[in-house]
């Protein structure tokens, strides 16, 4: 039997910080200009009317209004102006 514990366990125990991705507001919710609607990697959700897309694929509202989700071959996020 070994008198010292093997080194395997001490090399484990790391994990990356969660990135908090996903929908930040639901369909039917009221949003203001600049509000973040979706945080994502790639385009799981696509921008439609009155929605902008940031460098990191974040979707955000371009106008004040109500969030609308539409699903065809892709899922589109739009904002109906008030």
From Swiss-Prot:
The keyword Ribonucleoprotein applies. GO terms for molecular function: structural constituent of ribosome. Disulfide bonds: none annotated. InterPro entries: Ribosomal_bL27. Coiled coil: none annotated. Keywords: Ribonucleoprotein, Ribosomal protein. GO terms for cellular component: cytosolic large ribosomal subunit. Pfam families: Ribosomal_L27. Residues 1-26 are annotated as: Disordered. Gene3D superfamilies: 2.40.50.100. One of its GO terms (biological process) is translation. NCBIfam families: L27. Belongs to the bacterial ribosomal protein bL27 family. This is Large ribosomal subunit protein bL27.
